[in-house]
Amino acid sequence: MTPLTVPLNEAARPLDRLADFPAIPEGWAYLDTAATAQKPQTVIDAITRAYDTTYATVHRGVYQRSADMTLAYEAARRRVAGFIGAASPDECVFVRGATEGINLVAQCWAETQLKAGDRILLSQLEHHSNIVPWQLAAERVGAAIDVVPLTPDHAIDLDDMAAMLTPAHKLVALAHVSNVTGAVLDARRAAELAHGVGAKLLLDGCQAVPRLPVDVAALGCDFYVFSAHKLYGPTGIGVLWGRGELLEAMPPYQGGGAMIDKVSFAGTTYAAPPARFEAGTPHIVGVLGLHAAIDYVDAIGLEAIHAHEGALVREAREALSGLNSVRLFGPADSAGIVSFMVKGVHPHDVGTILDEGRVAIRAGHHCAQPLMDHLGIPATARASFGVYNGPRDVAALVKGIERVTRIFG
């Protein structure tokens, strides 16, 4: 089984912040946090306040409000850096989301550093956003892609990874936490294995950042990406962290305002990172919303969140395993996610019936079709927990599954 980054702390288990989330009505079990988290009132207030009272452009105006907004914008960058253990705020690039962050690395690092015959290593459980950008880059430069198999409980098999790695591998890109199985990667060991053959390691942290303490220095990775909307923040904003020396060597991602040093028809020079990768007017208020979301999560404590979600996962798995019709996927110690199937029932039908009982889950391939092919199934049903969930939501889920089995029994 994949080891947890942080041991469960039973004392921290009583955690139910439902009252903080105005969009969750009474009696509705929202179990789709892995797709997108609901937003606490503090985040909504921060966004509304910015538009209502303080809004202005950043890095451009000489008037006081613009200067104040620029200070707030860069304060958010410093907050992000501290939150993930970055050595400098300049290593934190604001992007539209993790998908754009991965595409940025694929185009600006992989396509400039890889050559024909080089290899990229992925795993069978990756999200499409951590597959397709590398396929595009590999096709353009003539590189090849290898795929790490999974353990019997659907986690990345690092022993197999160790056996597969060669000096031809220049990049390893893996999910820190699987969006389907909730399996937690031993990221430190993955980094050591990758660096042992001279490869760089990119981690997709979308499911990890809302659930586990993340310290990029301690993990030893070279790039790390995540999206704000899974961290109780707004959509349309995310973060790419990269080692300073790697970002410095990368060309721009897009051309436009803000990413330049000097423009002339004789030639253009570019700004240093992170500005080099942030062309155009940024998602200013989204960045402030991300800051508020980090403050919200930090006030609760990621150790407490991890313990709380771990307890709900155990309760859900124990209850569902008692139903003969249910097949569970992933390790028992998954981070906040329970994927399952009801025998003889398509997951879309499961999701529809649960919705009738006011239980919201995800049903489908979860943007992980290669994993579904590996499992030999078209889709799964997925329940994923957040700080607003409690035992009542597990009970509602189980009651709904029992109804599914009666209807299709």
Predicted regions span which residues?
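Pyridoxal 5′-phosphate
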Residues: 1-409
